[in-house]
């Protein structure tokens, strides 16, 4: 439980730095959790079928058959406990979704205005003054702890982690810098070019030759396409490496792009991660969950 609460709060926080990234992650994850909860809530169906309409000639005490009921539908399979757990989750996720949606208007407002107007002047202004409110650590910790609470208290922590696949990838990619194997600057956000209004991968410079362990790690990551290295043309010594975050990785693989485009790529990745999570949870649960399908 401690590890889940720590990861969920920091997983969103370290995948940040561009306007709209933090709140869009929270919105997509909360929608995924809400949809998962709705699968377990029954419809209050109470059908009554008169026997004479069925043409039954058998002797039966009751003149009608009741089908359905409060606890007889949904994936809870009649379990009132499961229904109450996912209702508890909804009590947190629905207000959280409302708060994040309202905040998105101010954090991504100029981008929405850009989408509506589609003018070059608006594009430049949006790049230079992209938001009227910033989430900071507060929103990241609020949303992350809300997810941890519903995952732990409603007993679907494994399913919750599946909705954090981009955050898990970002954490694993960041591990060499987070644990000191590669130098980690204070800020690893993409670098903004004021002349082209494009974002480029930010880099970490090596003033001294990196150790053999660091060089080997960076060479492996470069071979996998996860970072881009700048080497001395004569000695082959590593001079720079792009910071190890998923945002910089997008820029390495897809090239420089505007902040708006980068947020859309992150949003699409988060949505794809949620779709893949549902495939694993309800399509491959027997292989992945090992009998415990919470």
Where are these regions (language model features)?
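Function-critical hydrophobic alpha-helical transmembrane segments in multi-pass membrane proteins
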Residues: 2-22
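Alpha-helical transmembrane segments
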Residues: 3, 20-294
